[in-house]
Amino acid sequence: MAIVQTLPVPLEPARETATAPQTPAMGSVSSLISGRPCPGGPAPQRHHGVPGPTFFRQQDGLLRGGYEAQEPLCPAVPPRKTVPGNSFTYVNEDFRTESPPSPSSDVEDPREHQAHNAHLRGPPPKLIPVSGKLEKNMEKILIRPTAFKPVLPKPRGAPSLPGFLGPRAAGLSGSQGSLTQLFGGPASSSSSSSSSSAADKPLALSGWASGCPSGTLSDSGRNSLSSLPTYSTGGAEPTANSPGGHLPSHGPGRGPLPGPARGVPTGPSHSDSGRSSSSKSTGSLGARVAGGLLGSGARASPGSSSGGDRSPPPPPPPPPSDEALLHCVLEGKLRDREAELQQLRDSVDESEAAVCQAFGARQRRWPGEREDCASHAQQATQRVQRAQQLLQLQVFQLQQEKRQLQDDFAQLLQEREQLERRCATFEREQQELGPRLEETKWEVCQKSGEISLLKQQLKESQAELVQKGSELVALRVALREARAALRVSEGHARGLQEAARARELELEACSQELQRYRQEAEQLREKARHLDAEAAGLREPPVPPATTDPFLLAESDEAKVQRAAAGTGGSLRAQVERLRQELQREQRRGDEQRNSFEGERLAWQAEKEQVIRYQKQLQHNYVQMYRRNRQLEQELQQLSLELEARELADLGLSEPAPCICLEEITATEI
C-alpha cells in the first residue's frame, strides 16, 4: 500500500513542470473511516503534515440507488478491528483495476512514472469531462472531475445523534421508500457492501453507548460528516474471510476484482476528484470522535490492537425498546455509511492517484502548450495585424475612389447643366433661325440655278481647256521630238565633224609621211646618181695607193670593179625593198582604221536610232497618262457633283446645288 500524494492546484497553470511534493496530511474523511491494515502487518506510523487547502467541491445530495435485498433491522455485528484515526489514507490496492489511460494524460506518462508509482499495477482510471453526481452504473470505472469548493464551517452546537443523522436518514428513506427496503431481506450478489456485511454482523448497543456517551459530536466531526457526499454503490463482493464491514482484500498478487457478471463492480465509479482534499481540511477532534463512533462495534473483537486501552464491553442489553430500536436503526445506517465511506475512500484514493498523475502530466504539458498557444496567438495577432493593415489600405483606397467618384459625379453634373444650357440656347437659336432658314432656302434655289448655268459654262470651258491642253501636249511632244531630232542631228554633225577632223589629221599625217617618203626617195635618187657617178668613176682604173693591202695588190682590176659594183647595187635593192614593205604596212593600217571608223559609225547610228525610238515611246506614254488622268479627274468631278446633288436632295432642296470651286468660278469668264 502506498500513500496518496496530493498536489496543490493553482488557479492559473504554472509555467514550471510539476515537482514531486512532500507527503501531505489527509483530511477528516480518513479519520472518520476505519482504515484497513496492510497485508503484511499493522500500518507503520507516519508523520502528519499541515492539511492542504481544499480545492475540490464537496458532493452534496442524498445517496442514490437502493439495496436490492432486505436485511434485518438489527443485524448482529461481529467484532471488528479499529484503526486509530490518522490523517492519511492508503491507496486501496484491492480495487485497483486495469483501466485504460486517462484521455488527458500522454501515452508515455505511465512509463515515466512507473518507478514513482510502482504500487499501482495499471494506468489511472479515465476522467469524465463532465462533472456531476455518482450514477448507478458501476460497470465503467470513470472519475468525473469537479470544480473546487471549500467546506463551509457550520455554527457550533451539540445536536443529538438522531438530529444529526435525521436529515440523511430521511433522505435515504425518501429515496428508497422505507427502512425495511433499506435494511431488510437477504443479500444478493449485486447488493451493497453495507447490506452484505450487515447480514453477518450483530449490532452492539453497548458499543454505541460507550463510543458516544453524550450523543453529541464536535464541530470538526460534524463538519466532516456533513461534508461527506452522498454515495450510491451497486454493491461489493461479499466474502466470509473479511471480518466486520471491510471490503475484501485480494492482495498485490490476486489481480483486479471480478467483472460485473458476478454482480460485483470492478472498482469505485463516478466519484468526485476532490473528495479527499475536501475531507483533509477538518480537525483532529472530529477524527477522534468519529473514530469512537465507528469503532464501537469492533471493541469486542479479540484481535483488535489499534483501539488502545479501553473499557470492556457492557453486558447484553434488555429487550429492545423504541429508543433501542431507533439506536439500532441508526447504527445500521451508520454501518452502511461506514461501508459506503470505506468504498468512497477507496474510490477517492484511486481518484486522487489518477488526478495526481493526470495533473502532473498536464502540468508537464502546460509549458509547451502555453508556448504553442503563445506562438499561435502571436501568429494570429500578426495575421490580424496584416489583415487590419490590408483592410485599412482597402478602406483608404475605397475612400479615395469614393472621393474621385464624387468629384467625377459633380463634374458630370456641371457638364450636364452646361449641356442643358447649350441645348436651351440651341432651341432658341433654332426658333429664331426658322424664318431666316426659309429665306435662305429661296436664295439657295436662286443661286442653284445660277450655279447650274455657271456649271454648264464651266464644263464647256473645261472641255475647251482639255482640248487646248491636249493640243499643247501634242505640241510639246512635237517640240520635244524636234528638239530630240535636232540634238541627234547636231550630235551626228559633231560626230561627222570629229570624224572629218580625224580624217584631216590622218590625211595630214599621211601627207607628211608621203612628203617624208618623197624626200627620202629624192635623197635615194641623189644617192643613186652619186653612186652612179662613183660607179662611172670606178670603172676607170684607180691609182694604187702608196700603201695598199698586199692581198688587194695581188687581185686583178676586173675583180676589184665587180666587187665594188656588187656592193653598191645590193645596198640599193635592199633599201627599195625596205621602202616597199613600209608602204604596204601603212596601207594595211589605213584600211584597218577606215574599217574601225565605219563600224563605230554604224554602232553609234544604231544606238542613236534606239534612243530616239525610246524617247518617242516615252513621250507617247506620257501623253496617254496625261489623257487618262484628265479623264479620271472629269469622272471624279462628275461623281462629286452627283453626290452633292444627292445630298441636297436629301436635305429637301427643290433643285440640287452643285459644289463649284470659287476660284474656278472667279477665274471663268461669264
UniProtKB/Swiss-Prot annotation:
It comes from the Eukaryota. Interacts with CTNNB1. Interacts with KATNB1. Also interacts with gamma-tubulin and KIF23. A motif (Nuclear export signal) lies at residues 632-641. Residues 213-233 have a biased composition (Polar residues). Residues 1-333 are annotated as: Required for centrosomal localization. One of its GO terms (biological process) is negative regulation of Wnt signaling pathway. Residues 451-670 are annotated as: Sufficient for interaction with KATNB1 and for inhibition of katanin-mediated microtubule severing. This is Leucine zipper putative tumor suppressor 2. Residues 187-199, 242-251, 260-310 have a biased composition (Low complexity). Residues 311-321 have a biased composition (Pro residues). Its main location: cytoplasm. Residues 329-650 form a coiled coil. Residues 448-670 are annotated as: Sufficient for interaction with CTNNB1. Negative regulator of katanin-mediated microtubule severing and release from the centrosome. Required for central spindle formation and the completion of cytokinesis. May negatively regulate axonal outgrowth by preventing the formation of microtubule bundles that are necessary for transport within the elongating axon. Negative regulator of the Wnt signaling pathway. Represses beta-catenin-mediated transcriptional activation by promoting the nuclear exclusion of beta-catenin. Belongs to the LZTS2 family. It is found in: Cytoplasm; Cytoplasm, Cytoskeleton, Microtubule organizing center, Centrosome. PANTHER family: ZIPPER PUTATIVE TUMOR SUPPRESSOR 2 HOMOLOG-LIKE PROTEIN-RELATED, ZIPPER PUTATIVE TUMOR SUPPRESSOR 2-RELATED.
